Design a protein with these regions (language model features):
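Binding-site signature for planar aromatic cofactors or substrates
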Residues: 1-125
Length: 125
């Protein structure tokens, strides 16, 4: 796991709308979802609430690598790539439950463990 750069942390606070969370199946076929129930955990990981994962959950269970893509209000794109951890209890799960709307089930918390961070085509770390 790498440390998220301050530029990305600041951009996260200025993101506009949903993120795109992409995983891959065993054959390498990508699956992308929009996610709005997301958070930045201790400035280390992007957490996505599992409210209605289907293919995404199967991919995570099969060890998929993943990426998160988001844009800021001024239209700047950021992408984080890495491994995915999945939490059904513990501090990451508790963090997700604090902000996930009660109307959604919040079955678990997918946590993207960053290995590379980009702003557009520029590698930040």
């Amino acid at each position: 796991m790498i440390q998220l750069p301050q530029e990305l942390i600041k951009a996260w606070d200025e993101r506009d709308g949903a993120i795109v969370f992409t995983t891959t199946d065993a054959d390498g076929t990508p699956n992308s979802i929009y996610a709005t129930c997301v958070g930045l955990y201790e400035e280390e990981m992007i957490v996505i609430a599992n409210n209605y994962f289907d293919k995404t959950m199967k991919n995570i269970q099969n060890g998929s690598r993943a990426s998160v893509l988001f844009i800021t209000k001024d239209g700047k794109a950021y992408q984080i790539k890495g491994q995915v951890g999945y939490h059904m209890r513990g501090p990451v799960y508790d963090f997700m439950k604090k902000w996930n709307p009660e109307k959604h089930p919040g079955h678990g918390a997918a946590a993207l463990i960053p290995e590379a961070v980009y702003s557009g085509s520029e590698k930040l770390s």
